Amino acid sequence: MQNLKAGGYLIAQVHQLGQRIFAKKLKKYQIVDINPAQGRILFALWKKDGLPIVELAKVTSLSKSTLTPMLDRLEEIGHLKRVDSKGDRRKKLIYLTEKNKQLQDIYYKVSLEMKELYYSGFTEKEIDQFEDYLKRILSNLKEE
């Protein structure tokens, strides 16, 4: 038991507390209808709008069975829409709505606030090294 390290536990704590703080910051802007996991979907679509569900699942690391009800909810509250693919009518592409595009600036601002909070007291070199370590951990987990 003495050889166990606390990395996984610490990552989970950072994730949980970070989500709570992020949601609290969004609430200051009256954004209460979107949770942090849904924010991950929106962030992916802000980077590349019109993704098929399979690709969206991949970039968000969410299973299709988890993603589908989240997309249903975001569509229901008017933040995205599903559109038939012109090349394959069986495939649905996910697009942001105009209503959602207005949120992007707020999310960006809150994300910058979170970045400042996360990396307070770190040098650029330390941040780069830390993120490299996280990428390696993520890669290890994806191999499993």
What is each stretch, according to the model?
Residues 72-132:
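Charged, amphipathic alpha-helical coiled-coil/dimerization segments
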Residues 53, 71-72:
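Short, hydrophobic-biased segments on the C-terminal half of alpha helices
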Residues 3, 7, 37-38, 99, ...:
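N-terminal positioning helix adjacent to the helix-turn-helix/winged-helix DNA-binding module
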